[in-house]
Design a protein with these regions (language model features):
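Cys/His-rich short segments
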Residues: 99-150
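Surface-exposed, charge/polar-rich loops and edge strands
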Residues: 179
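Beta-strand segments within the central parallel beta-sheet cores of soluble alpha/beta enzyme folds
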Residues: 200-203
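Nudix hydrolase/Nudix homology domain
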Residues: 1-111, 166-168, 210, 230-268
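N-terminal strand-loop-strand
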Residues: 129-169, 174, 196-197, 220
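Active-site-adjacent beta-strand/loop module that shapes the phosphate/pyrophosphate-binding cleft
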Residues: 206-229
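Hydrophobic alpha-helical positions that pack around
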Residues: 185, 189
């Protein structure tokens, strides 16, 4: 099915897909051994208390809402599952909608008051935006752009392990104000592992709900320098061939894994 984004809620509807969250966990319906996104008129009909319900669009012919769960009492037939864990239990399209829904719910929660004058914000009826009735400041959902890059040297990929983590992944970091994406790739690589890169090429992008980011993926070639982990974010880094990758690498839901898979396919 095709998801169509819309902030304009229908005047009436029978049932809808409800993407309801408590923290980073999403409510799912347990239906005969299947895990599904709840499809009902509204959560309260099943004793599920929510707040901040926001209409987000349609998935095929089904209307979609997101909301924050405010009750702690478990409800029979439903469960809360970490959004990271649900990837293998629902379709990729549903996971994409769920990721979008989480970002909208948290944006609605964290933008209740005007950052300029402190007045309570009002929700725009035609788009995803908050408007201050006092000073007319308009705020849109926060998206933090970040780069992620697969750096290759003589058929090997640079993978790094962050401090207090067991996972090895490619270099990533947030874009600073006034930077181009290519400048961010060069700066983050230099800062985190002490090398310079060349031939930076765009690969793909991915919204990443867990940090409200838009991940912009690149490939690049090693140019100069020796690996020196900064010790603040990166504790260990090295070059790996396709047949000697670390056991702990990012999962299949991430663009980081897509970059590593690209490397394996290209250089095997």
């Amino acid at each position: 099915m095709t998801f169509n984004v819309s902030a304009i809620a229908p005047a009436a509807y029978n049932k809808a897909c409800w993407y309801c969250f408590k923290g980073m966990s999403i409510l799912v319906a347990e239906n005969g051994g299947r895990t599904e996104i709840p499809f009902f008129t509204e959560p309260s009909a099943y004793g599920i208390k929510t707040s901040r319900a926001v209409y987000i669009g349609t998935n095929g012919s089904n209307h979609c809402f997101c909301a924050e769960i405010t009750s702690d009492t478990p409800v029979k037939g439903f469960a809360l599952i970490s959004l990271r864990q649900i990837y293998t239990l629902i379709s990729s399209d549903e996971f994409s909608i769920a990721s979008r829904a989480l970002q909208i719910v948290n944006w609605d929660l964290t933008h209740r008051f005007c950052g300029r004058c402190g007045s309570p914000m009002q929700t725009h009826t035609q788009e995803f935006a908050k408007i201050c009735p006092s000073c007319n400041l308009t705020l849109y959902p926060r998206i933090s752009p970040a780069i992620i890059v697969a750096i290759v040297k003589e058929g090997k990929i640079l993978l790094a392990r962050r401090v207090n983590s067991e996972m090895f992944s490619v270099i990533a970091g947030y874009v600073e104000a006034g930077e181009t994406l290519e400048e961010t790739v060069a700066r983050e690589t230099q800062e985190e592992v002490g090398i310079t890169v060349k031939n930076i090429r765009y690969f793909s992008s991915q919204p990443w709900a867990f940090s409200y980011s838009l991940m912009l993926a690149f490939t690049a070639e090693y140019e100069s320098g020796s690996i020196v982990p900064d010790g603040v974010e990166i504790e260990e880094a090295n070059w790996y061939s396709p047949d000697s990758l670390p056991e702990m690498i990012p999962g299949p839901i991430s663009v980081a894994r897509n970059l590593i898979n690209w490397f394996k396919t290209t250089y095997s």
